[in-house]
Amino acid sequence: MSVIDVNPIPLAPRISEAGVADYIALLKPRVMSLVVFTALVGLLMAPGSFHPVLAITAIICIAVGGGAAGALNMWYEDDIDAKMTRTANRPIPRGRVTRPEALTFGMTLAFFSVVTLGILVNWIAAGLLAFTIFFYVVIYTMWLKRWTAQNIVIGGAAGALPPVVAWASVTGSLAVEPILLFLIIFFWTPPHFWALALFRNDDYARAGVPMLPVVAGPDHTRLQILLYTVALVAVAAAPWPLGYFDVIYGVASLALGGWMLVLAVRVYRHRSGSAALRATRNLFKFSILYLFALFAILLVEVVAAAVLRLIG
């Protein structure tokens, strides 16, 4: 069993007062963009009428809740961030924002996002948003990430919940469709983050994070990436023959999934040298495009169906 060093290193002292850009960085805007986009698709797919103001309110609350979770993640992981090249320039390690400031910022945003969603939209959606924040901050950040190589697999549930929250904002209930969206993101998460972990392996090892390549080795990680990619392709395509999504989505999901599978096979085959590094980077980059494209196609289908209803 590997011994992981999780002892923190001293953080940089405050070098100046925090600016707006520092607090925006705490929100993890790149992650937030994915949260907003998948939530928007979930909201527009939901049946029934929904006032535009409430729709905008729901999306903003989900985005702010996701940002709050990101800020609380940075608050708790300041020791890890300081050790990793990829994260050393974040506001807390750089001394731009203190840990108490990040904690206060994150808790305030979390509270107001949940309460606002509950009061103005409905409390089922608010409860799901609160659970999402709790799962990401407590279950994933505080527990899973430091203690198990399955951190990404289990913790990925938090990142898969935004379209479920958005659907519940409209309907006040759950259904098969948002669960399908959840499953797509859930199975997408391991190949995406394990590809990152492969070419950032030294970074994670230095920080004491038990990512799969650190604990089980790169070769086992490559196998798991391939297996989860196969599962992802099947899960993403399944809604079409089951009658939940249309043929355009079905064909596109197979095409996108087929190429992602090709990239995963390349990761599995190339195990050393520049070819291995190139394969993992290509899979990581394409996985981002894959998810955005898949949900964009769903968005187009929803908008097209709405237009046809109006002119029909």
UniProtKB/Swiss-Prot annotation:
Question: Which Pfam families is this protein grouped with?
Answer: UbiA
Q: What is its main location?
A: membrane
This entry's Enzyme Commission designation comes to 2.5.1.141
Chain segments annotated as coiled-coil in the UniProt record:
none
Recorded GO molecular functions are:
protoheme IX farnesyltransferase activity
Q: Where in the cell is it found?
A: Cell inner membrane
Per the UniProt record, which residue ranges are transmembrane? 31-51, 52-72, 119-139, 152-172, 179-199, 225-245, 247-267, 288-308
What is the name listed in the Swiss-Prot or TrEMBL entry for this protein?
Answer: Protoheme IX farnesyltransferase
